[in-house]
A protein has these predicted regions:
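A short local loop/turn or secondary-structure capping micro-motif enriched for an aromatic residue
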Residues: 23-25, 63
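Residue-level detector of alpha-helical secondary structure
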Residues: 26, 30-33
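N-terminal processing/targeting junctions
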Residues: 12, 25-26
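Short, mixed-charge low-complexity intrinsically disordered segments
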Residues: 34-78
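Local beta-strand/beta-hairpin segments that build beta-sheet-rich folds
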Residues: 15-16, 61
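Short aromatic-glycine-(Arg/Gly/Cys) micro-motifs in beta-strand/loop hairpins
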Residues: 1-15
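Conserved aromatic
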Residues: 16-22
């Protein structure tokens, strides 16, 4: 399972949901950005670290974080 969070003010997390497919998480991310941001022309950039993907879209202190849930990590290690 993929978990999607919106990080604002540099550290506060807002949970956006669990997703099975990465494309579903990306679609939810884009829909949230479109309805919740004043940035009309976002420029998405990703950076990866371990099992986390950070997606910046142009805001100074806000970004999206995609992680693999703990349950999925356990299944992969077994």
């Amino acid at each position: 399972m993929i978990e999607l969070y919106f990080i604002f003010n540099g550290h506060r997390r807002y949970y956006l949901g669990n997703f099975i497919q990465a494309q579903d998480a990306i679609d939810a991310l884009k829909a949230h950005q479109k309805t919740s941001s004043a940035i009309n022309n976002p420029r998405f950039r990703k950076s990866m670290s371990g099992n986390a993907i950070r997606i910046d879209y142009g805001a100074v202190d806000c970004y999206y974080l995609i992680t693999i849930s703990k349950e999925k990590e356990k299944e992969q290690n077994d």
